Amino acid sequence: MVEPREQFFQDLLSAVDKQMDTVKNDIKDIMKEKTSFMASFENFIERYDTMEKNIQDLQNKYEEMAINLAAVMTDTKIQLGAIIAQLEILMINGTPLPAKKTTIKEATPLPSSNTNNEQSMSTYSSSISGKTSETVKKNPTNAMFFTRSEWASSKEFREKFLTPEIQAILDEQFANKTGIERLHAEGLYMWRTQFSDEQKKMVKEMMKK
């Protein structure tokens, strides 16, 4: 017969063993959860790195596109300014001459009254040929073939090919603009306010050719 004291210790040891088994099982479950969590976390890190790389690639592409777009817009604005300058000259002087490369010094000045394009003038007497004066048409539309920089910045160009009245209007309307931006704004203003329907039709027909 087992004594009460021995029975007590046996029961206590049995209870401790059961509790230890429970703790061991809990530890195993925790380790499994830890392993699963670490796998998920590593997968998350890989996905984050991939996402970060994709974002960086997109940012690089965006910056490259922004640079290309700025270059295209600048070139387009310059070309549009050149077209607007031609429209201004066309409105003031009528149908242009055949294309001819010239400079501002070679261009014929605009008549001060701007009445019509058929006004004549006497040519100078040639010291070589000895020709006498003859009547010729004054057609200053050679200015259409200036370089873009001359269109955008030449004060002499404005004085020669725009009447004082038009210059005054444009100076008042666009005093806060300069360069190509001002040329663009002036051209649009003149197209909308100064061109007749007939002139607009003629310009549109020319642009189709």
Curated annotation (Swiss-Prot):
Induction: Expressed in the early phase of the viral replicative cycle. Residues 110-119 have a biased composition (Polar residues). Residues 107-135 are annotated as: Disordered. Keywords: Activation of host autophagy by virus, Coiled coil, Early protein, Host cytoplasm, Host-virus interaction. The keyword Coiled coil applies. Belongs to the asfivirus K205R family. This is Uncharacterized protein K205R.
